[in-house]
Amino acid sequence: MEFWRHPGDLRVACDRARAGGSRVGLVPTMGALHAGHLALIAEARRRTDFVAVTIFVNPTQFGAGEDLARYPRTLERDLAACAEAGADGVFAPDVAAMYPPGEETRVRVGATAGPLCGVHRPAHFEGVATVVTKLLSLAGPCVAVFGRKDYQQLQVIRRLVADLFLPVEIVGATTVREPDGLAMSSRNAYLSPEQRRAARAIPLALAGACRAFARGERRAAALLEPARARLAAAATSIDYVDLADPESLAIWSDSAAIGERALLAVAVRVGTTRLIDNVVLGEDAPPVAEPSEEAS
């Protein structure tokens, strides 16, 4: 497996792979890799011949008071995991390489970035869009793979690629979950054992809405209120529990009657840790069984 620190080295390696007839796949990450990330690498491996993983804790997507300094950095362990997963190379630049002195360009995002996390992290998606554009420019992949846990990020990137006519297929990979249903996240490491137990309310809330939707419930309030109540009882605070159009991310009001597909997205804080998750009602299976079902 190759290891690149400089942007030009990533470009040269991907150019060389293409010249040899390989399809290039890109898996952008911020490191602290877990089984969810390894599933992204496997998906890229399945679709392409040369898989480049990027590990970069991108400062422009963190706001004031967020966890940039605290975010886990485990490069040596991550490199070993990438090699075992079959990556052909890892790009792990420092901040100065990606944002050299004098650089000032940012990618402006639109309406897709406005609701949900955009309300609470107003500069986040501009930072995401900027770094992803840089990485796509450097690697020139046929395919780039992102996790559906970060559903809004996935939609912002799809919009970016369409609007800028970038010749890359954006693949959204299924969320990988812990045995109790909690979505895998590098930030789960922040949770104490008690907080980790409380966080299980997230997949349970989503699962309850999935089952109600499957029974024919289409009133937004009837889907949202039980989820909000369950999360309010377990979380320190709630940023949002919303239903949205799965494509545009336009928010449906609590009084709406929704259609045959709907994104249910949540962001909560357990202690000081912000956790996000989602399901597409009408498409995704419940992320976890109800406790009574597990006991039967």
UniProtKB/Swiss-Prot annotation:
Example GO BP: pantothenate biosynthetic process
Pathway: Cofactor biosynthesis; (R)-pantothenate biosynthesis; (R)-pantothenate from (R)-pantoate and beta-alanine: step 1/1
A cellular-component GO term for this protein: cytosol
Entry annotated with the keyword Cytoplasm: yes
Compartment annotation: Cytoplasm
Keyword terms of this UniProt record: ATP-binding, Cytoplasm, Ligase, Nucleotide-binding, Pantothenate biosynthesis
The enzyme's E.C. designation: 6.3.2.1
Transferase found in the keyword field: no
Cited CDD domains: PanC
Listed GO MF terms: ATP binding; pantoate-beta-alanine ligase activity
Binding of beta-alanine, residues: Q61
Major subcellular site: cytoplasm
Superkingdom as given in the UniProt entry: Bacteria
Residue positions binding ATP: 30-37, 147-150, 176, 184-187
Pfam families: Pantoate_ligase
UniProt: (R)-pantoate binding residues: Q61, Q153
InterPro entries named among the record's database cross-references: Pantoate_ligase (IPR003721), Pantoate_ligase_C (IPR042176), Rossmann-like_a/b/a_fold (IPR014729)
Family recorded in the similarity comment: Belongs to the pantothenate synthetase family.
Task of the protein: Catalyzes the condensation of pantoate with beta-alanine in an ATP-dependent reaction via a pantoyl-adenylate intermediate.
Additional note from the record: The reaction proceeds by a bi uni uni bi ping pong mechanism.
Quaternary assembly: Homodimer.
HAMAP family for the chain: PanC (MF_00158)
Protein's name according to its UniProt entry: Pantothenate synthetase
Source organism: Sorangium cellulosum (strain So ce56) (Polyangium cellulosum (strain So ce56))
